[in-house]
Amino acid sequence: MNEHELAILRQFCLDAEPASCTPYGCGHINRTYLVATAGGRCYILQKINHHTFRDVAGLMENIELVTEHLRRKSPDPRSVLTLIRTKDGKSYLEADDGYWRVFRFVEDSICLQQPETDEDFYQSAVGFGTFQQLLAEFPAEKLHETIPNFHN
């Protein structure tokens, strides 16, 4: 972990001092890191690609609205992202080099880059269907359009 990553992480309400920060996953949009703390908890640190998401405030407000709704509807707390706030209560950090956010890491979870079996396809469909069902009553008009005309 370099000094810059450490300085970024110290701005968030983590359970303890960051002990490690390593690149994580194969994302194509944001830069993602797995963070472990001295307290044993893990987090996901992401540098948001503000060239793709020009309205970072709107993006983060969308995430807050959707995760709050899902948390009220879902019987499984592991199925909903937990956003970690900055020490001044914000959902993301604006630094000299861009925008950063932190989520609690979901232990024993996986993220497939490509389904390998029929079961992978099935579980992906179940997850997506459950997500859609839980959002059925969500007031979509509250969401910001963070990438203009993306859905057109």
Name the predicted role of every residue range:
Residues 20-43, 47-152:
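Conserved ATP-binding subdomain of kinase catalytic cores across diverse folds
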